[in-house]
Amino acid sequence: MKDVQNEKDPRMVPLKKVGIKDLHWPLKVILKEDGYQSTVAQISCSVDLHREKRGIHMSRFIEVLNKLEVITPQIFEEILDDLIEIMEAKRAHLEIHFPYFTWKESPVSRKKSPLKVDCFVEAEKEKNFSFKIGVRTPVHTLCPCSKEISDYGAHNQRAFVEITVKTRKFIWFEDLVEIAEKNASSPLYTLLKRPDEKFVTEKAYENPRFVEDVARDVALKLEKDPRITWYRVYVESMESIHNHNAFACVEKGDFVLEG
């Protein structure tokens, strides 16, 4: 059977990335508390294409991805190595996004409910292997300015803290979620009874945070974590009294700690 993809291309233009995207794939996430959580991931993967080749064999991505069952750094490097070999490429890239549910206990009534967190993994290999993981955690922020100038209350809203890290040692998704929640005005909860709602509202009022505050505090926490070699923090609040959102971002290398 004729191999069209393997035909020589006369244009002689190399392509940096060729691949598949938005592939839905079942996989398991290892839990910090032992066990696994099943989820459905959205996958994009690619390789570079030599200037003399017309195309790649897309089906080979799926064949290689068949070994992806549980998320670990080791399996990602294996997949990239296999893609480079089978596609006769120099570079391979893999990106995965998936929902992950943490079980939260409400602060007063102690009732449990799941909270969805968006997780992602990005891996690339050329000469060296690069591996990033991250979370996008929903939190609660209350405006310090609104509290300061108002006689009654303060505007508050849901916000998202996106943390992306490179590490020298394994780090749990749950650890990143905890860092995001502890540096906001308050965590979010799916289930709150009236005593819980009172507690969360008052806690946020006593702990006002701009997006700038959250970004800086999260960055300082990551800066001091010996496991982390690089990070990026992006905070966005769904402003409740404005017809726009507010955001702040910072990454390692943007500043130097003094003292």
Curated annotation (Swiss-Prot):
Q: Which superkingdom heads the taxonomic lineage of this protein's source?
A: Bacteria
Q: In the Enzyme Commission scheme, what number(s) does this protein have?
A: 3.5.4.16
The GO annotation for biological process reads: tetrahydrofolate biosynthetic process
Q: Which Pfam families match?
A: GCHY-1 (PF02649)
Its pathway?
A: Cofactor biosynthesis; 7,8-dihydroneopterin triphosphate biosynthesis; 7,8-dihydroneopterin triphosphate from GTP: step 1/1
According to UniProt, the reaction catalysed is: GTP + H2O = 7,8-dihydroneopterin 3'-triphosphate + formate + H(+)
Record-stated family: Belongs to the GTP cyclohydrolase IV family.
Q: What does this protein do?
A: Converts GTP to 7,8-dihydroneopterin triphosphate.
Which protein are we looking at?
GTP cyclohydrolase FolE2
Q: Which organism is it from?
A: Thermotoga petrophila (strain ATCC BAA-488 / DSM 13995 / JCM 10881 / RKU-1)
**Lineage, please?**
Bacteria, Thermotogati, Thermotogota, Thermotogae, Thermotogales
Gene field: folE2
